[in-house]
Amino acid sequence: MATTLSRDQYVYMAKLAEQAERYEEMVQFMEQLVSGATPAGELTVEERNLLSVAYKNVIGSLRAAWRIVSSIEQKEESRKNEEHVSLVKDYRSKVETELSSICSGILRLLDSHLIPSATASESKVFYLKMKGDYHRYLAEFKSGDERKTAAEDTMIAYKAAQDVAVADLAPTHPIRLGLALNFSVFYYEILNSSEKACSMAKQAFEEAIAELDTLGEESYKDSTLIMQLLRDNLTLWTSDMQEQMDEA
């Protein structure tokens, strides 16, 4: 669709693409909305969520594909099947190129439009968290210096988001909780800092529990779901750490 649509039309088309599960096109509609918004004003909550859902679905299927291909690659290497290993490596490389492209697309949008135009604290945390998330996705499959850089960029974005969240958002706010969830996963999976991951998840969970009675009805479901995920991770990570200590 080469024609330029109005902002409302882009929102409608993004919803249509979402219903049809055509997430690459959903991304395109939301990118056009953001790039074409003059002046580059702040997105509404609905627009922001549509953008997030679009990218989350595209990156989600690619991350799942990468994990499957990587696991097949390990199996083929253990079987010493050189021909298959070579084919799988090439295929993994193709998936990684797509992952890099999607990540750089949203990161470019965040740096050029979304973060600079964010005025509300909630928006700032949302976009800085998103920036951290997509640098983290790069760190998942990059190696060497590229992985180190992606991890450093993740840390900077998450820390900036955390500073605003702790200052301005309630401990029960779903965006603050989501940040704590993803930041702790980053510590656990990318930095291999199990203790820091656990302490961060535990603190976020306990601070939210202490203020649970202040939760508004509209965000109750979102907040309690993320709290459940924080608790699930804590349980899993604690038992993993216990197993490692037992083995040692």
Swiss-Prot record:
What Gene3D superfamilies does the annotation carry?
14-3-3 domain
- GO biological process annotation, one example: response to freezing
Using the record's annotations, give every residue carrying the modification Phosphothreonine: 214
Quick check: keyword Cell division in the entry? no
Protein location: Nucleus; Cytoplasm
| Keyword field | Cytoplasm, Nucleus, Phosphoprotein
State the deletion phenotype.
Disturbed levels of several metabolites (e.g. beta-alanine, ribose, aspartate, pyroglutamate, glutamate, asparagine, fructose-6-phosphate, myo-inositol, 1,4-diaminobutane, palmitate and shikimate). Enhanced freezing tolerance associated with enhanced cold induction of cold-responsive C-repeat-binding factor (CBF) target genes in the double mutant lacking both GRF6 and GRF8, probably due to the suppression of ubiquitin-mediated degradation DREB1A and DREB1B degradation by the 26S proteasome pathway. Enhanced freezing tolerance in the triple mutant lacking B1L, GRF6 and GRF8.
**Similarity field:** Belongs to the 14-3-3 family.
UniProt subunit comment:
Interacts with the isocitrate dehydrogenase IDH3, and malate dehydrogenases MDH1 and MDH2. Interacts with CINV1.
- Protein name in UniProt: 14-3-3-like protein G-BOX factor 14 kappa
